[in-house]
């Protein structure tokens, strides 16, 4: 559920976008200007929502990010332009949208941009002093990062299911194939619409994908069956966006094939959950252990390490990741499997 605009942190105003090409600004169906209440990075905030640099539903052009998606009112194309053009150079984001879902897209945009993400408790001196030095330093350098909340359950769940127990490369390759094959062209924003921008399939469209197309995409029967099971309850699934993140994650796991890892990955993106941890991730536990103690660990060890910061554990992980830290590598890498010719 999208909160009333007046209830969202930061400030907003209807606007005509001076920084955008005049014909583009004039042609927008709905537009808005949002002022974050502090430092802000559009690319670092929305980065976790992209399924790689070739995500068919996104296009990044410098300080501008385009995104095409489905709303309850229909498809929309949204253009998000980051600038420092507010009073005294304060950051702002210019928001424009086109298509039947333009109004819904703009109303949801502040939450998408992280307007509801409150770091006050994390930054409170007594709490901050308990954090490892690398996390403290990372936070100092990443004050502009927010946790985004897309509110779009199906759009996040499908690609995350495809990433279960396979490499990111093969999962994203399959996702791109299916979105291009079964998605729809993004609503046009005049001559400026990025070429090839696609709205990912709706739940109904995903349910029409035949078994041989999943196979051609390199998606095995276990993962495709999980997608189909989940999307047969798409209406109930979308309602989870209105629930608290941890409750939504628990309810999601009632669906066979959706476990703790999938649920955590989803609510991190749909709800901007500051605490959910991707237990069961192939790399995360070893990565966190190496970063915090110099030694690899397992899921139980990772949870024990992060327990002092419960309520903000995902923030801690994001800060570690923002440092560029790399754990020492030992043993074989996970092999990309290609079963499309079998």
Predicted regions and their residues:
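HhH-family (HhH-GPD) DNA N-glycosylase catalytic core used in base-excision repair
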Residues: 2-342
């Amino acid at each position: 559920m999208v909160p009333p605009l007046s209830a969202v942190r930061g400030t907003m105003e209807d606007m005509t976008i001076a920084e955008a090409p005049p014909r583009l600004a004039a042609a927008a169906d709905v537009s808005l200007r949002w002022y974050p209440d502090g430092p802000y990075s559009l690319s670092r905030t929305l980065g976790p929502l992209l399924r790689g640099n070739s995500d068919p539903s996104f296009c990044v052009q410098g300080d501008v990010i385009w995104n095409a998606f489905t709303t309850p009112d229909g498809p929309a194309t949204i253009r998000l332009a980051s600038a420092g053009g507010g009073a005294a150079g304060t950051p702002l984001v210019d928001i424009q949208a086109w298509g039947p879902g333009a109004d819904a897209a703009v109303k949801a945009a502040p939450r998408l941009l992280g307007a509801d993400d409150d770091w006050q408790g994390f930054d409170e001196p007594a709490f901050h002093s308990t954090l490892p030095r690398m996390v403290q330093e990372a936070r100092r350098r990443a004050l502009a990062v927010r946790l985004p909340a897309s509110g779009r359950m199906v759009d996040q769940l499908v690609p995350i299911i495809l990433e279960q127990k396979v490499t990111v490369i093969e999962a994203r390759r399959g996702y791109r194939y299916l979105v291009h094959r079964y998605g729809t062209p993004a609503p046009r924003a005049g001559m400026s619409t990025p070429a090839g921008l696609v709205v990912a399939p709706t739940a109904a469209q995903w349910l029409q994908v035949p078994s041989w197309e999943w196979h051609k995409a390199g998606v095995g029967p276990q993962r495709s069956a999980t997608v189909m099971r989940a999307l047969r309850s798409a209406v109930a699934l979308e309602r989870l966006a209105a629930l608290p993140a941890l409750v939504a994650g628990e309810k999601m796991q009632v669906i066979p094939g959706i476990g703790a890892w999938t649920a955590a990955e989803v609510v991190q993106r749909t709800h901007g959950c500051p605490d959910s941890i991707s237990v069961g991730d192939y790399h995360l536990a070893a990565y966190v252990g190496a970063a915090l103690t110099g030694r690899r660990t397992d899921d139980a060890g990772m949870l024990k390490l992060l327990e002092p910061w419960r309520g903000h554990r995902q923030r801690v992980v994001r800060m570690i990741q923002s440092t560029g830290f790399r754990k020492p590598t030992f043993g074989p890498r996970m092999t990309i499997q290609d079963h499309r010719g079998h």
